[in-house]
Amino acid sequence: MEPKLKLWVEKDGVLVFSDYRAMLLDHIAKTGSIRGGAERMGLSYRRAWGKIKEIERNLGVRLVESEVGGPGGGQTKLTPEGEQLLARYRSFRAAAEADMKRDFAEAFGKPAVHGEPVEP
């Protein structure tokens, strides 16, 4: 057996941030575009942009900034606030996952080997 963690953050009962939304920001940062991030997630550009605007509205900060045109076309990058949100969420998630695994091991003990009983 192995524990799994599904994590999200709410503000006043409204979903603000989650693993899925963190992944979207990460893909945008890596590809340099909302379209590229959306494609990696299997989303339309419109849906990805809508998710970003929803997070920004709920948190009251800008997460991405876009530059239009130029020799290589436009580019989108995370704002310092977007980078900080992503870094803090990753850190929080890693700590929550480590705690969960520790608590799981304490509650269920080590996995059985070759049909041996599990020892707590």
PLM regions and their residue ranges:
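Basic, amphipathic "hinge/linker" alpha-helix immediately C-terminal to the N-terminal HTH DNA-binding motif
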Residues: S66-Y89
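Residue cluster at the C-terminal edge of the helix-turn-helix DNA-binding motif
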Residues: R57-R62
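Short helix-boundary/capping micro-motifs
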Residues: I28-E39
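Short, Lys/Arg-enriched N-terminal segment that forms or immediately precedes the first helix
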Residues: M1-G13
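Alpha-helical linker/hinge and terminal dimerization helices associated
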Residues: R88-E106
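Central "turn" residue of the DNA-binding helix-turn-helix
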Residues: G42-L43
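Key DNA-contact positions within bacterial/archaeal DNA-binding proteins
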Residues: R46-R47
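Residues within the DNA-recognition helix of helix-turn-helix
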Residues: K51
